[in-house]
């Protein structure tokens, strides 16, 4: 799983334990405390985001679903490969999907497909799903190209969903949260799941500066959708700045170590900025490692990828070394 290898912060564990005593009460349906905390943290980063610009969801997936039910897009454009949750959401409203294929010859770099992507973003398109960084490639988009896409989509009347669920793992990444007031067609989605290692709690948020659009999305979210425990854990996690910085440094070191080792094995490695790595090998590595009770992600079912593409998560150093040892044994025994 692509969650933080450092595990859940101790402060969040404490908040969860404390919140259990309040589970005999209904959660705050407005998530006021959590929104206030997020807005305060955004202010520290100089993002012009207020509490009213924020919607909370039972994970990012619930927010993607609420977006498509609010907008009812007939056609979406999605760079491929990308997270399958966008496809799942579009299928719920019987929407058409057009894929802009990222090329391995270009390092799956989204900046290289900019012209192809813009050409697909015509008046017939209702919504564009972007991930920054991309999952499964781990690639970040350049700031200038994000701006260009946002400008073009605004001119064409196209909504943009910017999925930033892994952005906190990227030390040098700039969030599109800076631009939610400038672009009324922009929705930024982030999650607590990955960076704070709390996938079992289900907590994500959406930021949108367009009041009308935001209210329409809110009407497509269920009542009481964020539990007492999730709200308290989120409010505590949002303040854990030192933990995020420590995570970024740790992931950067371990990712470089893994990428170098995979390259030495002779695999084609997609250089990543996130906490996971995409690579290609002709070995049936998924099956070989499964026999050793190690599970990696077979990416052959991603749109735009074929048999032989795999993704691994950056984990604790001892786990990373164990994985590499097992891969080495697979190569020797092949």
Language model region names:
Residues 1-59, 66, 334:
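N-terminal small-domain helix-loop-helix segment of the aminotransferase-like
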Residues 9-13, 30, 185-270:
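PLP-dependent aminotransferase class I/II
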Residues 69-130:
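PLP-dependent aminotransferase-like
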Residues 93, 155-156, 183, 265:
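Helix C-cap/helix->beta junction micro-motif
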Residues 105-168:
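Active-site phosphate-binding strand-loop segment of PLP-dependent enzymes
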Residues 251-252, 262-293:
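Conserved PLP-binding catalytic core of the aspartate aminotransferase-like
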Residues 291, 301-334:
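PLP-dependent enzyme catalytic core of the Aspartate aminotransferase-like
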